[in-house]
């Protein structure tokens, strides 16, 4: 759940940045209403229970509702939708409006079976992309912590040039507190 909350809290910090752009024609204080965060978990038996607990604490997930079979037919996925007003930081501390966190619209898709990453991408684009018709899609793996303005800069690349079809951000390894992560040769390299 630490990796999951690192990513979601980073996304919510970015939503706060979008909303802080009060002179923008696109964003501003209600900018959060133009953003939907889609979370896709690859397999109900594979997702860590503490990640589900984090989603439940944010109000997104309810335990005990998902069923394997409905009307004698196997279920492919379970979809939960909620607008949360709280975030869990990587230390599992609640952050809300008092800390500047803006509301966040979340769709959580809990796939019944583990069918790997590309299948999850298909779910995102074919199911949610068609329903939401977004102008820009940004895919993040769990554990990736976007900087507080990173998603804005990715969005801006698309906004400034309609010929841009893809963009990639810079990835930096987390050095840890007191740069202790540098003792790990993979991080240090």
From Swiss-Prot:
GO biological process, one term: chitin biosynthetic process
Keyword vocabulary terms for this entry: Cell membrane, Cell wall biogenesis/degradation, Glycosyltransferase, Membrane, Transferase, Transmembrane
Pfam families per the UniProt record, alphabetical: Chitin_synth_1
Family note: Belongs to the chitin synthase family. Class II subfamily.
GO cellular component: cell septum; plasma membrane
Protein function: Polymerizes chitin, a structural polymer of the cell wall and septum, by transferring the sugar moiety of UDP-GlcNAc to the non-reducing end of the growing chitin polymer.
Keyword Membrane among record annotations: yes
Gene Ontology molecular-function annotations: chitin synthase activity
Its membrane topology: Multi-pass membrane protein
InterPro entries: Chitin_synth, Chitin_synth_fun
Protein encoded by which gene: CHS3
Origin species: Ajellomyces capsulatus (Darling's disease fungus)
Name this protein carries in UniProt: Chitin synthase 3
Catalysed reaction equations from the record: [(1->4)-N-acetyl-beta-D-glucosaminyl](n) + UDP-N-acetyl-alpha-D-glucosamine = [(1->4)-N-acetyl-beta-D-glucosaminyl](n+1) + UDP + H(+)
Entry's EC annotation: 2.4.1.16
